[in-house]
């Protein structure tokens, strides 16, 4: 879902997948197969929050969503991520140039829930010891002038100014955000989930927070409970 700036501030893309049909994500909202793998699945058994759906990511699946995006010098990506099982890593690539190799950032959740992030082209250091079966809010803030990014997990900064992965390597340059690409292209077992993807200009200070409808609903419930005690 592409958003206009006036209604939603800095966010220019947001997707909860709640309105998607269960089954293949490919073919819905311009999601595509990537790297000749299989499609991830939309399902409603596991999701972030009490209602809705999420994307099930398993072994030998890779999917891609491209964007027109923006030319802002600072942009962000926000999403909720969870790995439940498997020796295979959940891999998330984000960039603008050549898909995969041209990623500005590559984030993995590996065996046992360990989270890694690329430090330029030099490697993928561990940035947090996560846990299996737990939802995490990932937020990446990209500085396209400095060619670096910061990475936050549940609001805690775990990466400070790591260089872009594709810069000067196989992928060329990353002038903006143009796609998100995720999955695991090998047979090692993986069970993971993605939900509530958001992209936009700036640092995305309110990204990952409940939207206005959620706030309104909670406010109505709150006042209803107060009235009940009167």
Where are these regions (language model features)?
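Short strand-turn-strand beta-turns centered on an Asx-Gly dipeptide
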Residues: 152-160
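Extracellular glycan-recognition surfaces and repeat-rich motifs
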Residues: 21-54
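Short, aromatic/His-centered strand-loop micro-motif at the edge of beta-sheets
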Residues: 115-139
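Flexible glycan-contacting loops in extracellular carbohydrate-active proteins
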Residues: 161-195
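Short tryptophan-centered beta-strand motifs in secreted/extracellular beta-sheet-rich domains
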Residues: 17, 77-79, 134-143, 149-151
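Extracellular, beta-strand-rich glycan-interacting domains
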Residues: 14-18, 188-205
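Extracellular carbohydrate-recognition regions
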Residues: 8-33, 78, 210-227
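Secretory/extracellular carbohydrate-interaction modules
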Residues: 53-115
């Amino acid at each position: 879902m592409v958003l206009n700036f006036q209604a939603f501030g800095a966010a220019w893309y947001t997707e909860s997948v709640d309105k998607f049909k269960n089954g293949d994500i490919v073919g819905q909202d311009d999601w595509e197969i990537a790297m000749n793998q299989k499609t991830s699945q939309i399902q409603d058994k596991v999701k972030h929050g009490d209602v809705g759906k999420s994307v099930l990511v398993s072994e030998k699946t890779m999917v891609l969503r491209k964007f027109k995006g923006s030319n802002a010098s600072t942009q962000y990506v926000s999403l909720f991520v969870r790995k439940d099982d498997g020796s295979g890593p959940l891999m998330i690539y984000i960039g603008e140039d050549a898909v995969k190799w041209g990623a500005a950032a590559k984030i993995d959740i590996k065996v046992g829930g360990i989270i890694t992030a690329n430090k330029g082209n030099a490697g993928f250091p561990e940035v947090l010891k996560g846990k299996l079966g737990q939802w995490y809010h990932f937020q990446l803030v990209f500085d396209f002038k400095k060619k670096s990014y910061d990475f936050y997990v549940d609001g805690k900064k775990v990466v400070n100014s790591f260089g872009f992965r594709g810069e000067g390597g196989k992928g060329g340059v990353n002038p903006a955000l143009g796609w998100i690409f995720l999955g695991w292209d090998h047979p090692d077992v993986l069970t993971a989930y993605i939900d509530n993807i958001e992209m936009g200009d700036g640092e995305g200070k309110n990204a990952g927070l409940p939207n206005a409808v959620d706030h309104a609903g909670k406010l109505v419930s709150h006042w209803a409970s107060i009235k009940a005690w009167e």
